[in-house]
């Protein structure tokens, strides 16, 4: 029997699978005091977005696996895990469709001015009909940065569903689907795209990938969507561009820092939609991710090979 620490809330199917396998499950509910206390003798950690630095992992003397609830693993110290024989797994494909749908929804909601018009209707009545018109997405150019699992779903929705021209920037791929354009110069994508959407991992290379200089390349009518990781965008530069009319709007499911400060300008700008890292949060996705994350723990503790192993 092993001890499993779950740092944040997950769909109950995962903990049920762990308990059925004979393990003891401890819930921390994002309480860092509980996490620091319980990780000391934990055999496994199931984590969502709580940071697991080497200083914390080093206290976990029995740790055999860190099972990530999701696919982004920038909150886990991989170097420590590699050097100490701790397995690290992700849940590939489990939430990619939900995240892609969220990104697509942000695009449409911004393009059609849904939120400001709805708010105005409540405040001033039918005169809200005179709000500045939205735009059609059909026929526009999408700039897709990162064509992994999520990016491929977004590509399909925009190209096949909305007849958009899609430009892809991803230095790690060699081929793109027929009818899609691949560019090797990110600046070219930013200059040409009507909507730029980010679907890349957070690495040293992608941190502040979208900085002040690159934001300045974008059309003033363009929209920026980020459902990847907050630090990929220089948030101060983004706010400045939005406030000064150099960018038409932004849809952000992730921010830097996270959560957003209550007094952040992002909450005050009418051309910004901010959601609380909510893109993966669907009934279907939550079920799949929790199940796979738990199955990975059970597999490693049973001496079997898990899915989505990165360490």
Q: What are these model-derived regions, one by one?
A:
Residues 84-86, 92-141, 145, 153-157, ...:
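Phosphate-binding beta-alpha-beta segment of Rossmann-like dinucleotide-binding domains, i.e.
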Residues 43-44, 65, 195, 223, ...:
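Short, Asp-centered acidic motifs that coordinate Mg2+ and/or phosphate
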Residues 50-57, 167, 171-265:
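Rossmann-like adenosine-cofactor binding region
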Residues 23, 86, 180-181, 271-272:
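Short, conserved active-site loop motifs that form the nucleotide-linked donor/cofactor pocket
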Residues 1-89, 191, 211-213, 217:
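An N-terminal-biased, well-structured beta-alpha scaffold segment characteristic
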Residues 82, 89-101, 116, 258-311:
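C-terminal helix-to-coil terminal segments
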Residues 150:
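Hydrophobic/small residue at the entry helix of a nucleotide-binding pocket
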Residues 28, 145, 169:
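The conserved SAM/SAH-binding core of class I Rossmann-like methyltransferase domains
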């Amino acid at each position: 029997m092993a001890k499993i620490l779950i740092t944040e809330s997950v769909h109950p199917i995962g903990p049920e699978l762990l308990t059925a396998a004979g393990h003891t499950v401890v819930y921390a509910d994002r309480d860092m005091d509980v996490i620091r206390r319980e990780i000391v003798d934990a055999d496994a950690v199931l984590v969502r977005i709580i940071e697991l630095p080497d200083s914390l992992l080093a206290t976990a003397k029995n740790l055999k696996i860190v099972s990530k609830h999701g696919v982004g693993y920038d909150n886990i110290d991989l170097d420590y895990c590699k050097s100490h024989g701790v397995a690290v797994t992700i849940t590939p494909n489990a939430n990619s469709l939900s995240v892609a749908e969220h990104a697509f929804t942000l695009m449409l909601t911004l393009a059609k001015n849904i939120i400001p018009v709805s708010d105005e209707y409540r405040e001033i009545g039918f005169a809200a009909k005179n709000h500045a018109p939205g735009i059609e997405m059909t026929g526009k150019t999408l700039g897709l940065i990162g064509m992994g699992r999520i990016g491929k779903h977004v590509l399909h929705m925009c190209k096949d569903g909305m007849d958009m021209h899609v430009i892809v920037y991803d230095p790690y791929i060699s081929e793109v689907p027929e009818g899609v354009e691949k560019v090797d110069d990110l600046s070219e994508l930013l200059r040409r795209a009507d909507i730029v959407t980010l679907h890349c991992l957070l690495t040293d290379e992608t941190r502040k990938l979208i900085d002040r200089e690159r934001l300045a390349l974008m059309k003033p009518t363009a929209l920026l969507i980020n459902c990847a990781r907050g630090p990929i965008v220089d948030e101060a530069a983004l706010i400045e561009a939005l406030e000064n009319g150099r960018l038409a709007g932004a849809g952000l499911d992730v921010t830097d820092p996270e959560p957003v400060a209550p007094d952040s300008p992002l909450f005050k700008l009418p051309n910004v939609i901010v959601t609380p890292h909510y893109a993966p949060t669907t009934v279907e996705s939550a079920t799949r991710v929790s199940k796979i994350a738990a199955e990975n723990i059970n597999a490693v503790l049973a001496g079997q090979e898990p899915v989505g192993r990165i360490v």
